[in-house]
C-alpha cells in the first residue's frame, strides 16, 4: 500500500488576536511554513475581511496550506496537505506557533490516497 499524501488539520485556540487579523503577517507566516516543510511555493493569496479576519492559501507544487482566522474568538483553522515523500507537513507547526502563539493546538493527521500500487499498475 502507498500513501499519496498527508493532510494535517490544525485547530489553534487562544491565538494572539492581533496576529489573527494581520494580513501581511499571515502571508509571511504561510511563506515561512512552506520553507520549513521543504515544499515548493507556487503562489500565496490572502484576503482581509471586514471588520476582522483573514483567509489565506499557499498553493504548493505538492498541494496547499490554508488558514481561516476568527480574531474575535482567538481561533484559527489550518490545513496542511502535501504529496510526495520529501515534504513533512508537521515541520510547519513551529512557524505557525511562533506567529500565532496559540495556547492550545490540536493536530489531526489524515493519510490521503491509500492505494495498492501493484493493483493499480496491473
From Swiss-Prot:
Function comment: Catalyzes the decarboxylation of S-adenosylmethionine to S-adenosylmethioninamine (dcAdoMet), the propylamine donor required for the synthesis of the polyamines spermine and spermidine from the diamine putrescine.
One Pfam family it belongs to: AdoMet_dc
Catalytic reaction annotation: S-adenosyl-L-methionine + H(+) = S-adenosyl 3-(methylsulfanyl)propylamine + CO2
Marked site positions, Cleavage (non-hydrolytic): 62-63
Record note on quaternary structure: Heterotetramer of two alpha and two beta chains arranged as a dimer of alpha/beta heterodimers.
This protein's GO CC annotations: cytosol
Cofactor(s) for this UniProt protein: pyruvate
Active-site residues, as the UniProt record annotates them: 63, 68, 83
Gene that encodes the chain: speH
Key words of the record: Autocatalytic cleavage, Decarboxylase, Lyase, Polyamine biosynthesis, Pyruvate, S-adenosyl-L-methionine, Schiff base, Spermidine biosynthesis, Zymogen
Pathway in which this enzyme or protein is active: Amine and polyamine biosynthesis; S-adenosylmethioninamine biosynthesis; S-adenosylmethioninamine from S-adenosyl-L-methionine: step 1/1
PTM entry text: Is synthesized initially as an inactive proenzyme. Formation of the active enzyme involves a self-maturation process in which the active site pyruvoyl group is generated from an internal serine residue via an autocatalytic post-translational modification. Two non-identical subunits are generated from the proenzyme in this reaction, and the pyruvate is formed at the N-terminus of the alpha chain, which is derived from the carboxyl end of the proenzyme.
GO BP terms: spermidine biosynthetic process
Top class in the EC scheme: lyase
GO MF, any single term: adenosylmethionine decarboxylase activity
Keyword field contains Metal-binding: no
EC number: 4.1.1.50
The protein, known as: S-adenosylmethionine decarboxylase proenzyme
HAMAP family assigned: AdoMetDC_1
Cofactor: how and how many bound: Binds 1 pyruvoyl group covalently per subunit.
Pyruvic acid (Ser), modified sites: 63
Amino acid at each position: 500500500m502507498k500513501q499519496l499524501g498527508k493532510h494535517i488539520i490544525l485547530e489553534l485556540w487562544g491565538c494572539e488576536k492581533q496576529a489573527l487579523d494581520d494580513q501581511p503577517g499571515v502571508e509571511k507566516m504561510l511563506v515561512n511554513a512552506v520553507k520549513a516543510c521543504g515544499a515548493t511555493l507556487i503562489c500565496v493569496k490572502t484576503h482581509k475581511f471586514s471588520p476582522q479576519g483573514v483567509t489565506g492559501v499557499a498553493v504548493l507544487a505538492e498541494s496547499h496550506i490554508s488558514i481561516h482566522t476568527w480574531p474575535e474568538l482567538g481561533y484559527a483553522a489550518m490545513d496542511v496537505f502535501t504529496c510526495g515523500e520529501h515534504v513533512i507537513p508537521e515541520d510547519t507547526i513551529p512557524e505557525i506557533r511562533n506567529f500565532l502563539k496559540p495556547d492550545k493546538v490540536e493536530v489531526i493527521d489524515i493519510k490521503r490516497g491509500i492505494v495498492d500500487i501493484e493493483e493499480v499498475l496491473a
